[in-house]
């Protein structure tokens, strides 16, 4: 396994021609002891992460504990336990202070903050979803899923800050562990060694095995949803588009509101094949693996047809058996009308890549979802043999059921459910804290 990432990983290209020592580990001039408890780390040294890139994101503080502003940065002010970040008010004090802007999306902003109890920096996601049903659905879905997930390769929820009553609920704050960067940012600046491609891929699949065992499809796997820290720990995030699926049910026509990033969509999603299965996530992981090998998206389609044509130009025209999986007559007719396209050799697309990585890539990016490799098979692939450990690849003990979906509920009801989930999380955290204080015994 890789025991380090050079200190300049996220600032300058790494040196790739240094020969590894006899134990198969890349030669390192600096190593650090492994924090954490992942059993698949069989060494006291673990990857050292994107150090310089992360250093550029560190914050400077005055002696009083207030953060210094960088040139051109929006001012962050604190009044009455409320901090302003890029025009957004974060009501998270007094526990969380010294906020720093990280990013924002359609209905929320993310900031880092200092937890005054643990003295750790955390990530706080402020979400204001209650004007739109779709945003409420995604918020509730993510909270329900992450409240029940507990896995080292999946982002956790440390705390949910909400109003005292559902009627006064306008915003919700989700506190999570702070991860210094993500795979998208990393690939924008650095070429990964094969060791790190392998290590990251294993962690993705390890987390996805847990997700799929819970009868959940992530549906939006992409580099920006894979968080990384300085020790190269990887965590899957953003479950707003995830869906519960029943392996015993025919999901023909399922996932009608699929809006995930086009570049990582499986072809069956665009072609309306018979049902949607866990294989859609496997396709996305294949696209991510290809991107780690080259720092370029494999299928950067500009629109629906362009996306499909880019896929066919690489994996080749579908066979007659593949076409039978497509129930949309227009889609099938379109594919039949296209000139035959041969499959491209992966070694030509990625010269110098580990042949085992390319073999796994080929099995992930198989056009027919019924012939695509599954997560358990991918974990057992020879490319990942140095990490593969079925005894340390846990599954979810309580899988989700279809009754836990809520597509047709009005936003007012969704708001109530969000508040109830936040309240349930708060009670569970209090019970766990009481149990710890009681010597591990359940509180009376």
Swiss-Prot record:
Regulation: Activated by dual phosphorylation at Thr-256 and Tyr-258. May be inactivated by lip-1-mediated dephosphorylation.
EC number: 2.7.11.24
Modified residues (Phosphotyrosine): 258
Motif TXY: positions: 256-258
Example GO molecular function: MAP kinase activity
GO BP field: cell surface receptor signaling pathway; defense response to Gram-positive bacterium; intracellular signal transduction; MAPK cascade; meiotic cell cycle; oocyte maturation; positive regulation of proteasomal ubiquitin-dependent protein catabolic process; positive regulation of transcription by RNA polymerase II
A UniProt-annotated Pfam family: Pkinase
Annotated coiled-coil segments of the chain: none
Cofactor requirement: Mg(2+)
UniProt family annotation: Belongs to the protein kinase superfamily. CMGC Ser/Thr protein kinase family. MAP kinase subfamily.
Protein name: Mitogen-activated protein kinase mpk-1
Organism: Caenorhabditis elegans
Name of encoding gene: mpk-1
